[in-house]
Design a protein with these regions (language model features):
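Short, charged early-sequence alpha-helical segments and their helix-coil boundaries
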Residues: 33-39, 45-75
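Conserved aromatic-histidine-acidic binding/catalytic patches
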Residues: 3-10, 89, 157-165, 253-257
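Aromatic/basic-lined ligand-recognition segments
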Residues: 190-323
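Amphipathic alpha-helical packing elements
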Residues: 8-48
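Internal, hydrophobic cores of structured domains that mediate oligomerization or house catalytic pockets
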Residues: 115-223
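Long, low-complexity, Ser/Thr/Gly/Pro-rich intrinsically disordered segments that act as flexible linkers
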Residues: 81-126, 133, 141-145, 276-309, ...
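A ubiquitous short alpha-helical element
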Residues: 1-8, 131-135
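Short amphipathic alpha-helical segments
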Residues: 34, 161-172, 257-265
Length: 323
């Protein structure tokens, strides 16, 4: 150990124990300010940075002291009673592609259940269709004539396992789109694409897999009243995004471009978090261009979707606010 080595705080007891105990007492998730206060009030021993790594070796790695709010939302399901997320995919089949899809799914090693034609499912899937290469009338008609559909589900996962699960589903979707399935609906995001769109996502994955996952697995933006938000980032082990019309206006965005700007901002932030997320902390600022106004990110729990819903994000939401 060098006498010049940086000293860092080591909470005693560990920070994850303090945060979990407070959540249990309150009976609800902690806010960013509450997390930071518990961290700031914690009794700590100052140790060399290399020593902290040695202390944690072979034990549960504690919450990142310097980035407690973000790291707690990312890992809280490991320490409290909570629903763990899964990737859930609906595969609609019929015609010549049906036996090929069945074989692909049987060999996938995933949790697969088979179900018969469901008229209500047709409306459900079509209502979730994205605008990327919209399905034509023929494809929509084929969806309505499906004879069988499959519910494909991953094992529940924590944040550090999410990306591997989603990459596995990306490869599965590529194979099913070529079979072809009649439609593929990613229920964990409330999102269905046309087969042409799924093939485009697969082509993008060959060049940039992270960009393909953000583009194909995340619904953005969804509008509710004057709020725009994303859905599906939990499949990548990350929080979703939420921004208000008033914040978009404060950045200088014209009302007719609110949806487009929210989509572009969410996509850029999603890609940044996937590729360089370890650098991100609550309070960091973002902008799409040098000329556009900046927004800062504040972490909070997911409140607009029920916890038992497959679209619920246990890793939280990043609310974007005027700088």
């Amino acid at each position: 150990m060098s006498f010049d080595e940086e000293l860092v705080p080591l909470p005693v007891p560990p920070l994850h124990i303090l945060l979990a105990a407070q959540e249990k007492e309150l009976g609800r998730p902690l806010s960013e300010s509450e997390i930071n206060k518990i961290r700031d009030d914690a009794v700590c021993v100052m140790v060399p940075r290399s020593k902290r790594a040695t202390v944690e070796e072979g034990k549960i790695v504690d919450i990142d002291f310097e980035n407690a709010a973000i790291d707690w939302h990312k890992r809280r399901i490991e320490f409290v009673e909570a629903c763990w997320p899964s990737v859930v995919l609906y595969v609609l089949t019929g015609g010549a592609g049906a036996p090929v899809c069945r074989e692909i799914l049987n060999e996938s090693g995933l949790d697969v259940s088979r179900r018969d034609f469901d008229k209500g499912l047709t409306k459900h899937v079509i209502s979730q269709m994205s605008g990327i290469y919209p399905a034509d009338k023929e494809e929509l008609s084929q969806i309505a004539r499906h004879t069988t559909y499959y519910v494909v589900r991953s094992q529940p996962f924590k944040a550090s396992e999410a990306l591997a699960q989603s990459k596995r589903f990306l490869a599965l979707i590529r194979a099913l789109a070529e079979a072809p399935a009649l439609s593929l609906s990613l229920e964990s995001a409330g999102l269905a694409h046309s087969l042409a769109a799924w093939r485009a996502v697969s082509e993008l994955a060959a060049q940039d897999e992270l960009a393909a996952l953000v583009s194909g697995f995340v619904a953005m933006p969804i509008r509710f009243e004057d709020i725009y938000y994303s859905c599906g980032m939990h499949m990548l082990g990350l929080p979703d995004f939420i921004i208000s019309a008033s914040t978009l206006s404060a950045t200088g965005c014209a009302p007719e471009r609110f949806a487009e700007t929210a989509r572009d901002l969410f996509h850029e932030m999603g890609y940044f978090l996937l590729s360089e997320g370890e650098k991100f902390q609550a309070g960091h600022t973002f902008s799409l261009t040098r000329e556009s106004g900046k927004v800062k990110a504040q972490i909070e729990s997911c409140k607009h979707i029920a916890e038992e819903d497959v679209r619920f994000n246990p890793f939280g939401m990043l609310r974007l606010l005027p700088e």
